[in-house]
Amino acid sequence: MPSTASDPSVPAAARVLRRHRETADTWTLELKMANDSPAPPFAPGQFNMLYLFGVGESAISLSGDPARSDRLVHTVRAVGPVSRGISALSRGAAVGVRGPFGTAWPLEHAAGADVVIVAGGLGLAPLRPALYRLLATRRRYGRVVLLYGTRSPSDVLFQRELEQWRHSGEIDVRITVDHALETWRGHVGVV
């Protein structure tokens, strides 16, 4: 897939449209390309290089719906200087984008079969576009099962969305945590 700029080594300008806290150290940012240009198309499994001016850049998986061309969505855990800086960006702040890069998952090869997706912690973020694609083309597949594990209930990403998917019946969503409080009513154990 083509880069966001004519020269893939040069970041294209984008602005933070929305910032949402997922967990204590993880944020989801929605980015809009400068000059209201469409976001570059991407496929499930790809990533962008996000550039924080004056700090550096980091490879961050795309975590949004690949069918939406109006924005890019990235889920970032604040662990180093670049990811901490990107996570702290407020609405309207500038960020550079290069990409998308990487090989897409060949979901079309699973047509007619059951699909099981297994993720742990932040690993759900790069799999989320695949889940969006599977939902958009749901009739092409057998059962779709998501097995997702985190350290604790407070580490579950996209909680509202996972509940919506679970209640829709379109995806069999199973969540397990390593350590649970007495109030946790789900599975306990590792994925």
PLM ranges: what are they?
Residues 81-191:
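FNR/FR-type flavoprotein reductase catalytic core
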